[in-house]
Curated annotation (Swiss-Prot):
Gene that specifies this protein: sfsA
Phylogenetic placement of the source organism: Bacteria, Pseudomonadati, Pseudomonadota, Alphaproteobacteria, Rhodobacterales
Natural source organism: Ruegeria pomeroyi (strain ATCC 700808 / DSM 15171 / DSS-3) (Silicibacter pomeroyi)
Molecular-function annotations in GO: DNA binding
Family listed: Belongs to the SfsA family.
The protein's name in its UniProt record: Sugar fermentation stimulation protein homolog
Pfam families: SfsA, SfsA_N
PANTHER family: SUGAR FERMENTATION STIMULATION PROTEIN A
InterPro entries: SfsA, SfsA_C, SfsA_N
């Protein structure tokens, strides 16, 4: 998945009200960017952090920049836009680039199911059980090389696990897919100390047949691509 416009570097001044970020461009101008991330962004939103913004000229958008990446200035990047995983995964699923899901011919995003929820992807194919795929973006790293989820309490995430378990109980494939939006991590774990209820919900869902799939990414200012399974 390539970004729609060329990203521009900036320095973060502050993130506030969750979805807003004041930034300084290289020419000294200060702009406010949209931050498409409802999480805590622990370790990613410190003032002075080098970031990459995507400009837009959409007259319908009040904010003319979107915050897409954190640049760790050591060759590694973290993707902070939580809409990116679904866009990148849709491309990978349609190309059948994920081995454990490559047999599915039809990819349907945002299908209603459960209790007023939408599954990120519903996959189907001749002779195959439907596969319900829920996607979570992983950006937290507190120990070198170890990605963690979640970075804040997520009651909604626990609800999604229960709904996946219900689909597994009906004979469908139910898959909890964690997409690691960091290039500096090669391991994954749940952050049970941050959200014990989510960790318990995950173990319950696994016991009821929900599958776990963890994917890494290639990230650069040009775009985000699905890489390997962990």
């Amino acid at each position: 998945m390539r970004f729609q416009t060329t990203l521009v570097p900036a320095r973060l001044i502050r993130r506030y009200k969750r979805f807003l970020a004041d930034c300084q461009l290289e020419d000294g101008r200060e702009v406010t960017a949209h931050c498409a991330n409802p999480g805590s962004m622990m370790g990613l939103a410190d003032p002075g952090t080098k970031i990459w913004l995507e400009p837009n000229d959409d007259p319908k958008k009040k904010l003319k920049f979107g915050w897409r990446l954190v640049d760790h200035e050591n060759g590694h990047f973290t993707g902070v836009d939580t809409s990116v995983p679904n866009r990148a995964l849709k491309t990978a699923l349609e190309r059948r680039a994920i081995p454990s899901l490559a047999a599915y011919e039809t990819v349907r995003p945002e299908v209603k199911y459960g209790q007023n929820s939408r599954i990120d992807f519903l996959l189907s194919g001749p002779g195959l059980a439907d596969a319900y795929v829920e996607v979570k973006s992983v950006t937290l790293c507190r120990e070198p090389g170890l990605a963690e989820f979640p970075d804040s309490v997520t009651a909604r995430g626990a609800k999604h696990l229960a709904e996946l378990a219900a689909m597994a109980g009906l004979g469908h494939r139910a898959i909890m897919l964690y997409l690691v939006q960091r290039t500096d991590c090669d391991r994954f774990t749940l952050a049970a100390d941050i959200d014990p209820a989510y960790a318990r919900a995950f173990e319950t869902a696994r016991a009821q047949g929900v599958e776990k799939l963890i994917l890494t990414t290639h990230i650069s200012p040009q775009g985000v691509e699905i890489a390997d399974m962990l």
